[in-house]
Amino acid sequence: MSTEQENVKKQEEAYSASNIQVLEGLEAVRKRPAMYIGDIGEKGLHHLVYEVVDNSIDEALAGYCTDIDVTINEDNSITVRDNGRGIPTDFHEKEGKSALEVVLTVLHAGGKFDKGSYKVSGGLHGVGVSCVNALSTLLIAEIHRDGKIFRQSYSKGKPTSEVEIVGECSDRGTIITFKPDGEIFTHTTVYKYEILANRLRELAFLNKGIRLNLFDKRPDEEGNTHEDHFYSEEGLKEFVKYLDATRGTPIIEQIIYLDTEKNGVPVEVAMQYNDSFSENVHSYVNNINTIEGGTHLTGFRRALTRTLKKYAEDSGMLAKLKFCLLYTSPSPRDRTRS
C-alpha cells in the first residue's frame, strides 16, 4: 500500500464526532456567505443593501411607511432610513434579550412569520438583516419609537454594546448603517450608484405612492455629490411607459391594466403592445424579480392566449383570415428530408 493510500485510510478511520462542527449564531453566514446572498462579488455586495431596503418596503406594504432614504457614505458604508414603525426594542422572553438584538443576530427571526404583523413580505425567510449584520465590520441600528431613540452597535454579527437610549424623538422609524467586511467581499467593497439607482427606481414603480431617495456623499472629480428621488403615482402603468420608451412605437396607446384579488392574493398586471420584434416581460412576486419565471407567469401567458383566442372566435375574426406561405429554395439540398 502506498504512503498516499495509507494517509487516506487514516483520515477515514479518524472521522468521528470531533469532526462535526456546530456553528453558533451567525457563524454559518460568515463561513458560507454565498449560500445566503448569492455570491461575494459585486452582486452580493449590493444585495446587502436590497435586504435592508426590503424590510422598509415590507413596512410600506403593511401601510406604515411612506419614505425610504438610502445613502452611500463617503467611506462606502450604507445608511438606510425609513419612517415605519421601528424595530421593536422591548425584551424578548424566549430569547432572553431585546427584540432588536434578536432580529439582528438570530436567523429566521422577525415579524414576517406573524400573519398579524405583515400581510405581504419580500423577506419571508427572515435571514435578511441578520445576514447583513454578519457580513459587516460595523452595523449601527438606531430605532425611533415610543418617544425615544434606541441605539445598538455590532461587529461581524456580534453586539459591541447594549441597547441604549440616546435621546428623545417625536417620529418613528428605523435607521441601519453598515459597512461591508473586506475579508468577505475581497473583490470590491465599493458601491456603484447606478446599480442602486436602478433597483430603487424599480421598487418605486412596483410600490406606487412610496418615495425612495438615493444620496451619494462621495464627491466626484469635480467635487459634486449626486442624488435621485424616485416616486410613481401610477405604478406599473408608468413602469410600462418607462420600459417601452426605447422599444418602438406602441400599437395601442392606452396601457392594458388589471388590478384585482383572488383567494386573498392580489394580482396586478400592466402591458402594452408595440411594433418591436421581441417581447420584454418582467414578473415579480412580493417585489422580487422572478427572472426565471414561474407558475404565475405561465398562468398569465395561458390566460392571455385563451382570452385572445376567444375574442377572435366570438368576433368572427378567424373566418376572415387567410394564410399563405411562399418558400423559394434555390438549393436542391434544401429539398431533402434531412
Please tell me what each predicted stretch does.
Residues 1-53, 102:
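Bergerat-fold GHKL ATPase/HATPase_c domain
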Residues 2-19, 76-99, 110-233, 239-242:
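GHKL-type ATPase core
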Residues 43-64, 133:
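Conserved ATP-binding N-box helix of the HATPase_c
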Residues 59-63, 122, 335:
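Conserved ATP-binding/catalytic signature of the HATPase_c
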Residues 327-336:
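Conserved small/polar residues in nucleotide/adenosyl-binding loops
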Residues 66-71:
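A conserved short beta-strand within the histidine kinase catalytic ATPase domain
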Residues 46-54, 97-113, 197, 240-248, ...:
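A short, contiguous, amphipathic alpha-helix enriched in charged residues
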Residues 22-30, 73-74, 167-177, 271-285:
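Flexible hinge/switch segments at interdomain interfaces of large molecular machines
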